[in-house]
Amino acid sequence: MADKSKFIEYIDEALEKSKETALSHLFFTYQGIPYPITMCTSETFQALDTFEARHDDIVLASYPKCGSNWILHIVSELIYAVSKKKYKYPEFPVLECGDSEKYQRMKGFPSPRILATHLHYDKLPGSIFENKAKILVIFRNPKDTAVSFLHFHNDVPDIPSYGSWDEFFRQFMKGQVSWGRYFDFAINWNKHLDGDNVKFILYEDLKENLAAGIKQIAEFLGFFLTGEQIQTISVQSTFQAMRAKSQDTHGAVGPFLFRKGEVGDWKNLFSEIQNQEMDEKFKECLAGTSLGAKLKYESYCQG
């Protein structure tokens, strides 16, 4: 994944900040969306428009806990397969995280650059669209996303935790969590999924057929690999393989980033009332939309 020293150094700093941060003081709001004070700053957001994207940048957009670390690994392995050079992250890969000087430093980084983000489409720097960078948009069903988000907060040492699943569910539905409401993110991206430089990826599809998903990603990025190469990357990118190496690649948070990776884990926590509330929210926000169909909500969130 990321260059160990740089990635883990950033995570360690964020965890250190979290130690003395109460949950009620974890967020600051920028342009109507809450962000964690341990990872983002208003100064960085103000500098974000100075970021100069390149046509060969690879942008990975997702709501938190939807598989961005998984896709980061896959794309890194694809780059290695075609270039024979191990991809290294000179900066923490999430575009909006870090200090406000990072965008100047990134000008000197070699291409292609992999850029992760949890931002809405209309919050991204305009140069990404002007220079026609490739954008992979990763989605996961909202129920499993919520459960994974809770476990990340409550399992990782030093990160402020929630008193109960019920408490977290209320905050998740209100958007009082890092990067705001899942459904706001979804509505915003729904309008842009059919763009020429945009590729939609469903977490559940990757779980069902990882090799096929990797092949689609490779073709979208213009990487032409043999079946043997695709299979090799697939074996290296299973949840089990990534979890086994997570301490080395992600430091202290590694085992918590790769906790279960199961489809349907929400059934262990959701009450009937919570199910109904989420189902109604889905209908209100995404029923009849392109993204609503792509999420296969009936298959993964009902029954």
Curated annotation (Swiss-Prot):
Q: Which reaction does it catalyse?
A: thyroxine + 3'-phosphoadenylyl sulfate = thyroxine sulfate + adenosine 3',5'-bisphosphate + H(+)
Tissue/organ expression: Specifically expressed in kidney and testis.
What does the record give under GO molecular function?
A: sulfotransferase activity
Which compartment or compartments is the protein found in? Cytoplasm, Cytosol
Q: What class of enzyme is it?
A: transferase
- Which InterPro entries does this entry report, sorted A to Z? P-loop_NTPase, Sulfotransferase_dom
Keywords of this protein's UniProt record, alphabetized? Answer: Cytoplasm, Transferase
Recorded hits in Pfam families, A to Z, give: Sulfotransfer_1
UniProt EC number: 2.8.2.n2
Q: Which residues form a coiled coil?
A: none
Tell me which positions the record assigns to the signal sequence. Answer: none
Q: Which GO terms describe its cellular component?
A: cytoplasm; cytosol
Q: Which of this chain's residues are annotated to bind 3'-phosphoadenylyl sulfate?
A: 65-70, 140, 148, 203, 237-242, 259-261
Q: Name one GO biological process term.
A: sulfation
Lineage: superkingdom: Eukaryota
Active site annotated at which positions?
A: H118
Q: What does this protein do?
A: Sulfotransferase that utilizes 3'-phospho-5'-adenylyl sulfate (PAPS) as sulfonate donor to catalyze the sulfate conjugation of thyroxine. Involved in the metabolism of thyroxine.
Query: What protein family is recorded?
Result: Belongs to the sulfotransferase 1 family.
Q: Spell out the PANTHER family in the cross-references.
A: SULFOTRANSFERASE SULT (PTHR11783)
Q: What is this protein called?
A: Sulfotransferase 6B1
Species of provenance: Homo sapiens
